[in-house]
């Protein structure tokens, strides 16, 4: 579980969390879970042989979130193919009685960064996916 305080920079002119900021916060939770599994994210994200770009992202807002809100993100992973996975996020506001305020899905594909061709997920990522695959089941 990842915890994050909504900052002013995360909000739009209406004072609520901007959709791209919410997706950024989801990516922070992704990075945090990789580190929690013992993956060195500096090495992981700068690997010259493997990249995992985002190919799809969506988010549904169920309730607004504002500057100062304490958010928790619970994630679960799903391997879709030998070269593709997605991460699903449930976002709750702690200061609002643990109310579910948003759900997001971010899908990644594994590629060779030189030729941009799909390739199988690295073993450490498959292990991470298996670890988190039952988190929200």
Swiss-Prot record:
Keyword Hydrolase recorded: yes
Recorded catalytic activity of this chain's protein: 1,4-dihydroxy-2-naphthoyl-CoA + H2O = 1,4-dihydroxy-2-naphthoate + CoA + H(+)
Presence of keyword Hydrolase: yes
Organism: Acaryochloris marina (strain MBIC 11017)
Broad class of enzyme this protein falls into: hydrolase
A Pfam family of this chain: 4HBT_2
Keywords: Hydrolase
Family according to the record: Belongs to the 4-hydroxybenzoyl-CoA thioesterase family. DHNA-CoA hydrolase subfamily.
Entry annotation: catalytic residues: 12
InterPro entries hit by this protein: 4-hydroxybenzoyl-CoA_TE, DHNA_CoA_hydrolase, HotDog_dom_sf
GO molecular function: 1,4-dihydroxy-2-naphthoyl-CoA thioesterase activity; fatty acyl-CoA hydrolase activity
Protein name per the record: 1,4-dihydroxy-2-naphthoyl-CoA hydrolase
Main function: Catalyzes the hydrolysis of 1,4-dihydroxy-2-naphthoyl-CoA (DHNA-CoA) to 1,4-dihydroxy-2-naphthoate (DHNA), a reaction involved in phylloquinone (vitamin K1) biosynthesis.
GO annotation (BP), single: phylloquinone biosynthetic process
EC number in record: 3.1.2.28
Pathway: Cofactor biosynthesis; phylloquinone biosynthesis; Quinol/quinone metabolism; 1,4-dihydroxy-2-naphthoate biosynthesis; 1,4-dihydroxy-2-naphthoate from chorismate: step 7/7
Signal peptide region: none
Lineage, highest ranks first: Bacteria, Bacillati, Cyanobacteriota, Cyanophyceae, Acaryochloridales
